Amino acid sequence: MAKKTAVELIALQCSECKRRNYTTSKNRKNIQGKLELMKYCSFDRKHTLHKETKIK
């Protein structure tokens, strides 16, 4: 089997409307906790907190 890499693909979910607006990658060796960023939500039309979720 293939070896697991340190880079993982994740989705960023808006904390207000609960939609997954962004996808990005994260290095698990450098960032241990969940990623939280202030990003623009086009559905709410404002900057909101986006939290890391898994891509299904």
Curated annotation (Swiss-Prot):
Any Pfam family matching the protein: Ribosomal_L33
Xref: Gene3D superfamilies: Ribosomal protein L33 (2.20.28.120)
Keywords linked to the UniProt accession: Ribonucleoprotein, Ribosomal protein
GO cellular component, one term: cytoplasm
Keyword RNA-binding: no
InterPro entries on file: Ribosomal_bL33, Ribosomal_bL33_CS, Ribosomal_bL33_sf, Ribosomal_zn-bd
Gene Ontology BP terms: translation
Coiled coil (residue ranges): none
Gene Ontology molecular function terms on file: structural constituent of ribosome
Membrane-crossing residue ranges in chain numbering: none
Homology family: Belongs to the bacterial ribosomal protein bL33 family.
NCBIfam families linked to this entry: PRK00504.1, PRK00595.1, rpmG_bact
Protein name: Large ribosomal subunit protein bL33
